[in-house]
Structures are given as structure tokens and as C-alpha cells.
Amino acid sequence: IRDQPRSRGLGDVYKRQMTDIRIIPVTTKKGLRTFIQFYYNLYEGSKYAVPYLRFDEWNTLSKDKNPAFDFCEAQYFLAIDYSIPKVVGRIAAIINHCANDQWNKKQVRFGWFDFIDNLEVSGMLLDAAAHWGRERGMEELVGPLGFTDMDREGMLIEGFHEKSTMYINYNYPYYPKHMDALELFQKDNDWLEYRIKVPEVTPPKFAKTAQFIESRYNLHVRKFTKHELVQGGMGKEIFHIVNETYKDLYDFQQLTDRQIDGYVDSYIKMADMNLITGVVDGNDNNRLIGFGVSFPSMTEALQKNRNGKLLPWGWLRLLRVMKCHATDTCLLYTSPSPRDRG
């Protein structure tokens, strides 16, 4: 279970004490590398955290590479203990103007929020994000969130002894305790994650129900070729369904054409076609109305790699997981119109 904390306003989050800790903005590429590196340092010995792919982090956080900066602005901050000296925390402050306009809110988001077990560090980081947002007319601090809903979201509050995946946030148990101690925040939303054991043989009741729905409503399972998804436009159609399906969900922001092109190029192009399945409506010219996208679980390979780099041996470890028996389901959507048909 993951929480979504939200501030009750943008007053001071934390009253600063006399301390050697300083919050500094990231203004250079070297600073951004330090910002990214802190996560790997903090979770180096964790059995449950999964290191993120470093190039993916760089592309997401770089203004010249992430299409979300067409409608977002952001500032990254580092907490440094100058008595050591050492980086002891980080936070990203983000304003998604498109989402704010869509939901009629004045929110500054915080994400990439990691810190040592020191309330002064976490409090000062959140205060820096709140102050940055307040200077830009924002009235509320909410997170952890990314630039868009395709980024990692939420703060883990249960399941700390379960292995994570590369697609979601993992954090130490002390994180939510810090949020509780900072009384300005309250829970805004919950996300649930499920682990499903797939039987070797499909249960007869399940198979019979699927066959009944398929024949009664003229729905059909559809597999794709890579050419159909990438060059043929079906990949874009998948994300158009995402926009349609999620438009009324919590703080969802419609994906732009540039974002969709980027996701098709980055993820769909690399996907295993056996793990992408669609459902089409035979009564509507075989229109795509639902789909699921999974990837081979990279958890074991990334944990062995630890530093998020693919070179020199990371590629080999990732290639081995293509034969694994665990998958991570990343996208599972159904258009609103056929949901009542099962």
C-alpha cells in the first residue's frame, strides 16, 4: 500500500534549527548526477529496493529530454550536512501546469524524495519545495508525485519486506513516520499493488466466463506485431485509451502527443510482443477497447547490478531475465464504454 500525503496549505513545513545542514538547489549537470546518485548510496544495502535504470532517471529529470517540461517546471534540491560533508537528502519540486489547469488546483508536487532518518533533513527538504512553490503562486504541496502519472508515485506504508520493482517507489519504514511527525500533512490518496500467482492451468470457471463474454459481446483477443505498434500507430492508440480511461482518476493529466511518441519509442518498441495483449470489439469494426502490457521482471538483474548502469555487464543480466517466470504488469486499461460487459 502506498500513501499520497497532501499539505493543508503552504505555510512553513519545518522550523529550522541551528544546524550544519543546508539545502542547495541543483543548477548544473554535475549537481544532477549527484542528485541521481544519492538514491543508489542510500539504498546500497537494501534487499528490497530495486535500483532504477540510471539513463532513465537522467532522461526523466533532464529538461532537454523529457517532453513533460513542455508544461512543467521543476527545481531539484539537495540536503548537505557540511559537518561531514555529505549529501543526506534530495527532493524535486514540480509544478504541472496542465494538471493544475485540468483539476483547477494550485499544487506544487514533490517527488524523488529521499533522506536519511533525520527529521530535520526531511523537514527542511519539504520546506524548500513548499517555499519554491509558494514563490510561484502555489497553495498546496502534494506528493510523492512525478511530472506525470507515468512516473513513480506514492510513499510505501506497508509491505517493506517485499521486493519492489523498477516501476514503483520503494522507501524505508521511517519515511511515513516523518510525514506523520510533520503535522502539516494529511493522507490524500491510497494506491494498492497486488502480486498474483498464475496457475499452470487456467481454472475452468475462469475460462468458461471468458468464453461466455467473448461470444455474447463479440469481443476478441488481439495480438500485435512490433510493426503494428510502432510504425502502424497501434502503440499510439494504446496511450489514447490510457487518456480516455484515466481522465477522471485522481489528478490524472492527459498525455500529449509528444509524450505518447516518447513512451512508444522508449517502452513499446522494446517490449516482448508475447506480453502485450489487446481486446477488440467485433461490433465496432474491431476497435481496440482494452489492453494489457507486461514486461519481464527486471528486479533480480537490477539488484545484482546495484548501480543502475547497463555497462559493462548490466546488459547481460537484463538479457537473462527475458527467460524469467515473473512479469511486471505496467499497463492494464479498458475503455469506459464496455466495462459493464465484464
Please report, for each region that a protein language model flagged, where it lies by residue:
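Single conserved hydrophobic/aromatic residue that forms the stacking wall/gate
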Residues: 1-17, 333-342
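Generic start-of-chain signal for non-secretory N-termini
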Residues: 16-33, 37-45
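Acyltransferase donor/substrate-recognition loop-hinge adjacent to the catalytic core
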Residues: 19-21, 169-250
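A conserved beta-strand-loop-helix scaffold within acyl/acetyltransferase catalytic domains
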Residues: 39-77, 93-101, 237-283, 288-329
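Glycine-rich, N-terminal phosphate-binding loop and its surrounding beta-alpha-beta segment
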Residues: 71-82, 87-100, 113, 122, ...
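Acyl-donor binding region in acyl/amide transferases
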Residues: 100-184, 309-339
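A structural signal for short, well-ordered beta-strand segments and their strand-loop junctions
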Residues: 139-146, 187-195, 278
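Flexible glycine/acidic-rich beta-alpha junction loops that bind and position SAM and/or redox cofactors
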Residues: 147-155, 197, 297-303
